[in-house]
Structure formats: structure tokens, C-alpha cells
Amino acid sequence: ITKDKSYTFDYEYRPKNNLTLAATIYKQEQDRDIQTESIDDIRIVSSPAGYTYGSYKEEMNFYGVTSKMNAKFEEDKKGLKLKSKYDYSNGQIIFGYDYQKAVNKRDSFVQSETLKSYNNGYSNKTLEGEDIQPVINRVKVNMEKESHGFYVFNKFDATNKLDITTGFRTEITKYNGKRVNGPNTMPFVAAKTAEINTDRRLENYAGEFGALYKYRDTGRVFLRYEKGFVTPFANQLTDKVRDTTLPKKVGFFDPPQVNVASKYVDNNLKSEKTDTVELGVRDYFFGSLFSASVFLTDTKDEITLISSGVTNPAVNRWKYRNIGKTRRMGLELEAEQNFGNWSLSQSLTLLNTKVLKANEEARLEKGDQVPLVPRVKATLGVKYNFTDKIALVGTYTYFSKRDTREIRESEDLNKDDDIIKHTIGGYGVTDLGVLYKADAYSNIKVGAKNIFNKKYNLRETSLEALPAPEKTYYLEMNVRF
């Protein structure tokens, strides 16, 4: 069950004709109550009490064990945006400040059925005494991300046909919080509780320079350079990996190894740093609005996700890693046409991505495609206006295949998980809706998504997948105050 709430308040004041002051306050809340169930095979390798060190180890296989998770996720975002725009004789200058605080909380409890009977590879056996118990995992998370951003942007009209733009932004980001895992219990393992505290501060800077030339009334060409950054989300600062250092019970010589045992570790994730050059044109041809651009983006420390599962967060493991350096070269095309009551739109994005500096741990080699990035994205849109207030809107969206990296459990429980490659297939979906404009400040939209019941996966690995919903219906209302 998911509950979303969103509140926004906008205010604009013009003390002079050439000065505009604007402010926005917003708050977003999301509460999710999740109950999931999974069936997994549990493997335990243990050297029981009473045996000489290393002289005897038994592998216990518990097949088809049912586990249930009850969890509550809370996300709260609130922020403030201040902006002032001043128009002068040959242009305009904008000053701004952004503030945002995001709080993520999680409280989850996972318990398997009681482990009792197992197979050691030769025969079926039964646990004894206090080792007859379920696997229990508890997690509590409270993480905060707070950011302060300051920026200035200037547009200078060098001539009637040439505009020059410059901009600068700085952001200070603070992370604070903790993640408590435990007390966790399972057969042959002493109860364990681990806590990770996060207290980090990042400072990032961005800038841009651009030029736009109007070669005729309807046509313009532009060139821009941008140096940017992307800061990590608070929940990306920790990994969930297999725990190979479980505490042994009193009397046991070797620590046990359990395939479903996990722990959280700090990953020291860095911010992404980007350098982008873009050249584009926009004009009208034969009554059609057309735009095209080519761009090249080099990213240092691009953040990528390596995950093990998609259906049950209780048994899912993940790692966030910075890729040394990546490159994207792309072409973007857009067009719009109007024929009476009909409006058509098309867009096409072609991307060629590659890794410039490898990350061996993530199995990313020089020349590989960047994970989770499709090479092609295309959209087709149609809109028919029945009246000035009522319109039929349809959209077709296509994504091509993309590569991923995923975590696969190692056969040797004394070693960390393996990383393998996987390719996710492409798909296209069609949405259809009716838009009603009540007035200049509000509208209502009702419709259906994926009207042809296209089968594809929201998330997937080479072993499992989370199917996307088939046809779904929605009601959307927008109001401006």
C-alpha cells in the first residue's frame, strides 16, 4: 500500500517592471507498507561443537524455505526555492537559492519458517535443540540528506541575433543518519547487531557557457558547454553484501557460513562530475517545428547499481559503485505538426555509450556499454481537440535493450558474491487518455496506460523478474494557485 501527498505554494512579486521576485515552498510525503513472501534455498556450512578445528564441516541444505517480510518505508521531502530576475538594457540576470531536506526511514522485519529438516548431500537429517529456529532479520534506517544550492545565470544580448549565456552553481550537501541491522538470529550463529552511522559533507560546483544565433525569424542554432554534477541519494551510501564474518556460538571452532546472511557496509560513494558539449538547431520547415542536437558527455565517477534480485527486498543484495569514466555521444530529434484539431509529435534519441576507465569489481571493462542506458528511445504522440476544453491524448514510447551488472551467489560460501553481465530486452507501450481543461489554472486527465497489455519487466535479473502491470487506469488532477 502506497500513500502519496504533495503540497506546493508559489509566490511571485514584481516591485519594478524589470525586477521579479519568486518563491516556492513544497513538501512531499510517501508512505509504503509492504508485505512480501519469498521461497528460497538456505545453505549453512558449519563445524559443530565438539569437533577438532577443521576436522569436520557439514553443509546443510534447507530447500524451499518460505520467508515473510513486513516493512514500512517513509520518505519526506521539503524545500524552498528563491529566485530573483533582473532585466537590464542588454539582457537579464538571475540569482537563486535552493534548499531541500529529504528524510528516508525504514523499519522491516523478516522471518522464515522454522528450520528443522535438511539434506547434507547424502541423507536427510534434523536439527536438534536450540538450533531448531527460524532465520530472523531486522532493519531500521533513518537517513537525512540536506542540500543548500546557490546559483547565478546571465543572458547577454550581444547583438539582435546573438545571445551569450553564462552560469555558475555551487551546492553544499550534508548526509546524516544511521542504519541498524539486528538483532539477527539463525541456526548455529550467535545473535548479531550491527550499526552504521553516516556523517558526510560534499561540496560541488557547476558552470555553463553558451551562444545562440538567430539566423532568421523562426530559426536559431546554439552551442553550449556545461560542467555539472550529480550527488548520491542518502540510501546509495551503503551496500548490502553477503556477511562472511558471522559470529560463532560458544563451543564452535569455525564461524558458520550462511548464504542468506547479509550485512550493510559504507561504500564511500562519490558525486558524479560531468562535462557536456552540445550543438543544436531549431526551426520551422513546411509548417512543422523541428529541432535537432548532437552532444558529447564525459562523466567521471558515474554511479551505477549492481543488484542481485528484484522481487523481494528482504533477500536482495546491492552495491553502488563509481565507474572510473564514461562517455555518451548522442543525437536528439524532435518534431511537431498541427493540422486543424490534430496535433502530432515525434522524438528520437540515439545514444552510443562506452566505459573509458574500467571498474574491475563491477566487471566493467574499457569499451563496454554503460549499464542501464538504452541505445534508442522513441516517442510518437497524437492529440485531438474535440473542443477548447476536451482533448484525446495518445502516446507510444519505445526503449531498446540495455545491459546490466548483477550479483550472483558464489558457490563457495567463504567468498564474496560473483558479478555477472545481463541484457534486458527492449519494449514499447501505448497510453491513451482524455484531458479536460476546467479553466486556465486546473485540468483533469483520465485514461489507461499500456492499453495493449504489452508484457515487459519493470526490473529483472538473469534469474528472476518483476513483471510490469498490464493495462492500468488512472485519474490525475492538476491545480495551480
What does each of the following model-derived ranges do?
Residues 9-13, 80-86, 150-156, 209-213, ...:
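Residues on the lipid-exposed face of transmembrane beta-strands in outer-membrane beta-barrel proteins
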Residues 90, 159-164, 172-173, 289-300, ...:
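Gram-negative outer-membrane beta-barrel transporters
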Residues 229, 389, 398-414, 434-481:
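C-terminal beta-signal and adjacent terminal beta-strands/loops
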Residues 1, 35-70, 109-138, 176-200, ...:
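Solvent-exposed loop segments that connect transmembrane elements
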Residues 90-94, 98-102, 138-298, 349, ...:
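Structural signature of Gram-negative outer-membrane beta-barrels, strongest in the C-terminal barrel
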Residues 4-182, 214, 291, 338, ...:
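Face-selective signature of the C-terminal outer-membrane beta-barrel domain
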Residues 27-31, 88, 99-105, 170-176, ...:
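Transmembrane beta-strands of outer-membrane beta-barrel pores
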Residues 10-12, 18-38, 214, 220-222, ...:
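Membrane-embedded beta-barrel scaffold of Gram-negative outer-membrane proteins
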